[in-house]
Amino acid sequence: MKKYAISSLVTFLFLLSVVPIIAGTLDEVKKRGSLVCGVSTGLPGFSATDEKGNWKGLDVDGCRAIAAAVFGDAKKVKYVPLNAKERFTALQSGEIDVLVRGTTWTKHRDTALGLNFAGVNYYDGQGFMVSKKLGVKSAQELDGAIFCIHAGTTTELNLADYFAKNNMKYEA
């Protein structure tokens, strides 16, 4: 019972510290009259502009839903395209109000960045894609391979971990 009480108290105190930050951002958004939403840099199906310059995709719809909830108008959004390296800095600095783009929710990011993650809205996976002509049957055969990868992503870290654990080398 004592552990439960202490755990509840710690959780309550944490939530008290977060609420003013969230409320402060919401107040700023309402005062400005629009939501500044960070999205991916042209990722079809998630966040990309069409031939008329209109933003489309799952992430864009998330931004619109927030704007509709805050203002009653889904069009009160300014989209800021961000790459993987820029996304957290933009949110931490206040350049954007909310980040709605591909971002893996990790324990480190949840605890070290000072950000609040919302629920997961998309699940994906990782794997290696190689030309069939190479005849590769196992990832163990990729020692010395060269990979194209987005810097600053969880995928980059997972690739490094995989190769280190298997005493293999690669170039990115």
At which residue positions do the language-model features occur?
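Ligand-binding cleft/hinge of the Venus flytrap
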Residues: 49-52, 64-75, 117, 155-172
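Histidine/lysine/aspartate-rich catalytic loop segments that bind and position anionic ligands
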Residues: 123-126, 152-159
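Acidic, polar ligand-binding/catalytic clefts
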Residues: 64, 68, 76-141
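N-terminal hydrophobic or amphipathic helices and topogenic motifs
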Residues: 2-13, 20-78
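Short coil/turn segments
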Residues: 42, 104-105, 131-135, 147-155
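Structured segments of extracytoplasmic/periplasmic soluble domains
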Residues: 32, 40, 65, 69-73, ...
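Short loop->beta-strand "edge-of-pocket" segments that line small-molecule binding or catalytic clefts
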Residues: 34-40, 56, 140-156
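Soluble non-cytosolic domains of exported or imported proteins
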Residues: 53-61, 82-85, 149-154
